[in-house]
Amino acid sequence: MQPPGAHATPPCADALVNAGLARVVAAMQDPNPDVSGRGLLRLMNAGIGVQCGVLESEARALNKGFLKRMETGQPYIRVKMAMSLDGRTAMASGESQWITGPEARSAVQRLRAQSSVVLTGADTVLADKARLTVRPDELGLNAELTALAAARPPLRVLIDGRLRVPLDAPFFQAGSALVVTCAAASARGRYQEEGHEMLALADSAGHVDLRKLMGELATRGVNEVLVEAGPRLAGAFARLGLVDEFQIFIAGKFLGSSARPLLDLPLAQMSEALELNIVQMRAVGNDWRVIALPVRAPGV
């Protein structure tokens, strides 16, 4: 990407000029409206040859979260789900550990580590005693990358509209978190005392306004959100058209007809089906990993 020309820190463009370079190749122009084009212009004005647009598609793939935030004011939203071959995510009792094997769980740890935010719901936290932390010993990375992941953990965000998760739950004991709710702001003090932040964002139906929440996270500099949630919350993201990417881990087992479905997504007709473009499918240990992108309607 082009060298920035902003002066919050010493700009890279000035460093390149001072280095006496003859030519600079940039994959793409910085989409940040505060700096867009200024770094390249600084180089050209200094007599440095500039070529922009080399391997731009690869650069966009590497920076999809930042690019989406700059271009739309929303983060890149990735929904991770694990299911059986018959499309079930948990037994009727809520038991879900473990559907997939250790290799798939290691891949999920790496997804968490690369994300700005890991977001979940009260149902998941209560049912699984989930912490949603990055577990360094399960990343399967070298020592340097493991240390980097441990030093820069994602922000954990809990959607808990009625504040059902107690403050002594493992999720809260694992570290600070952002709790998004519809409940009265009077409870904020209790959470702040424990090192957590509370944000009240209710929509007209009395639910947490997910679209506004994504905008709020973007204003905080969040590029990528990983949603790890049950069928109700994951289905809400899908219904609102907020999902950019599904990552589905499929285990070679059947959980049966009474087990819980993948998504709470009530549809009556085939024409309502959410179409996906499968861009990758590969084996992960004894499981399969499918990466699929929602097919957007023209103009969306």
Enumerate the predicted regions with their spans:
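Enzymes that bind and transform nitrogen-containing heteroaromatic metabolites
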Residues: G5, V25, S36-L41, Y76-V300
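Charged/polar, solvent-exposed surface patches and flexible loops
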Residues: N18, A61-K68, S106, R110, ...
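Short capping loops/turns at secondary-structure boundaries
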Residues: N32-S36, C52-L55, M70-Q74, Q97-G101
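Proteins enriched for Cys/Gly/acidic motifs involved in redox and nucleic-acid/cofactor modification
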Residues: L40, V54-S84
